[in-house]
């Protein structure tokens, strides 16, 4: 207990609440436009892992650069720490190719990948997934049996068919067109009525906008 886990700052409060509930100690690390600040991360001692959202940082919307990702992987290898990648909002990149998962950068990278279907199916569709190294599969299977007793098997079978038959990918393509138009409309409205008060921060993707006021 009391293991230290680094998190991006600003962060998703639920992540902090969950860590503290489990007896972990969250260590906030500032985020830059290139991703989590590696130099500040290196100054921390005895960090067991780091939770990052490299594809679309919440709440600022930054996308971690490939160079920063490489540095993060190198840090994890040196420290013997785990990287937990929450692939938040990654499907909805407008006019851009999907970004590779951190584990794809290097074989054997100490990464645990988290994904969810909530953003692209519907908000109440609470089904998520994890991709873990082979040596951790048994551990996570045991944990899943203890903490997840309510996931609908029917929903899982339907989703599997939806993906295998190619419907999921065409569905995501349609969603991207819809959300891109909505985002563009929101950006235009903000530019017209609020530009004197601040600016939009982050990349042009995902389902949320972050507006930074000039004078908080």
Labelled PLM ranges:
Residues 1-216:
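PLP-dependent class I/II
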